[in-house]
Amino acid sequence: MSPYVTMILISSLGLGTTITFTSSSWLMAWMGLEINTLAITPLMVKQHHPRATEATTKYFLTQATASGLLLFATLNNAWMTGEWNTMELSNNLSAPMITMALALKMGVAPMHFWLPEVLQGLPLLTGLILSTWQKLAPFTLLYMTSHELNTTTMTILGLTSTIIGGLGGLNQTQLRKVLAYSSIAHLGWMVIIIQYSKTLALLNLLLYITMTSTAFLTLMTLSATKINTLSTKWATTPIATMTAMLALLALGGLPPLTGFMPKWLILQELTKQNLPALATLMALSALLSLFFYLRMCHTMTLTISPNTNNNMITWRKKPGQKALPLAMLSIMTLMALPTTPTMVAIMN
């Protein structure tokens, strides 16, 4: 693909998300989502591989369905209330339809069926964009309308996502599918807490993007797409392999890594809201995700080949262009937990 075309598509991605961020009208917000979808579709299919074509087709059909449902719900809301404002969602029929449409856009369970299959057919860089940037626009709409949405529906969606995200990753051998189910589980935490604390939901989104970016970039450095290939990477890129292992543990929420911070604060907030049963279920579902991350790290650590450093040096790769951003993201992923009191003070 031409660099000029790639630049135009990436600019369109930024434009679509910005339009959704700044719009107060449902029609403009829908337009921003459509620009996002149309911009990422050529980026997904640029390899001309059958799996990439299949993944792009699945993604496009799913996003088109979600967009159609969202447009119908907003038109119905405008017809019944006479309001196009995104903050006005008083129609009883439109609110659940918009919830389902945004859940389908993001990949929240039980509308998650497309996400693992689509990510599996994409290269890691495009998968990174799909797992992080493409979540921003629909999450913004969910953020703006959360006060109008049904609390029970949001709770069921969030709890289902955390459980399915944990169970779905248990029997996977492909790293991209593992990261897809990790994304589903993290979205469940955001959907749960957005009803009670919007600032916590934003913090969770920010840390999720940071940790997921670190995981994807380290896997790109390692050129790894399967779990069993991680065990052979110690000889070529030992530092990146160690970073990948710690980033995966951070995604699982293991202290003292950064991933523990949002789970800690969310469970604390749910307890303050007098929801101890929900907090307990969320904590137990987080153990499912942590288990398959620990299994991956077990595979990586117990199969280190007994080579001396002299044998390993000649095979090590030189640092690439991703070294500096990866280093900065890694520091945030691994060492931000001590800043939790500062984060809480800023949010309050």
From Swiss-Prot:
GO molecular function: NADH dehydrogenase (ubiquinone) activity
Similarity remark: Belongs to the complex I subunit 2 family.
Lineage summary: Eukaryota, Metazoa, Chordata, Craniata, Vertebrata
Enzyme Commission numbers on file: 7.1.1.2
Localization: Mitochondrion inner membrane
Function comment: Core subunit of the mitochondrial membrane respiratory chain NADH dehydrogenase (Complex I) that is believed to belong to the minimal assembly required for catalysis. Complex I functions in the transfer of electrons from NADH to the respiratory chain. The immediate electron acceptor for the enzyme is believed to be ubiquinone.
The keyword Electron transport appears for this protein: yes
InterPro entries xref list: Complex_I_Subunit_2, NADH_DH_su2_C, NADH_UbQ_OxRdtase_chain2, ND/Mrp_TM
Protein known as: NADH-ubiquinone oxidoreductase chain 2
PANTHER family in alphabetical order: NADH-UBIQUINONE OXIDOREDUCTASE CHAIN 2
Membrane topology: Multi-pass membrane protein
Pfam families given in the database record: NADH_dehy_S2_C, Proton_antipo_M
Gene Ontology terms describing biological process: mitochondrial electron transport, NADH to ubiquinone
Spans through the membrane: 1-21, 25-45, 60-80, 93-115, 149-169, 177-197, 200-220, 239-259, 274-294, 326-346
One CC-aspect GO term: mitochondrial inner membrane
UniProtKB keywords: Electron transport, Membrane, Mitochondrion, Mitochondrion inner membrane, NAD, Respiratory chain, Translocase, Transmembrane, Transmembrane helix, Transport, Ubiquinone
Encoding gene per record: MT-ND2
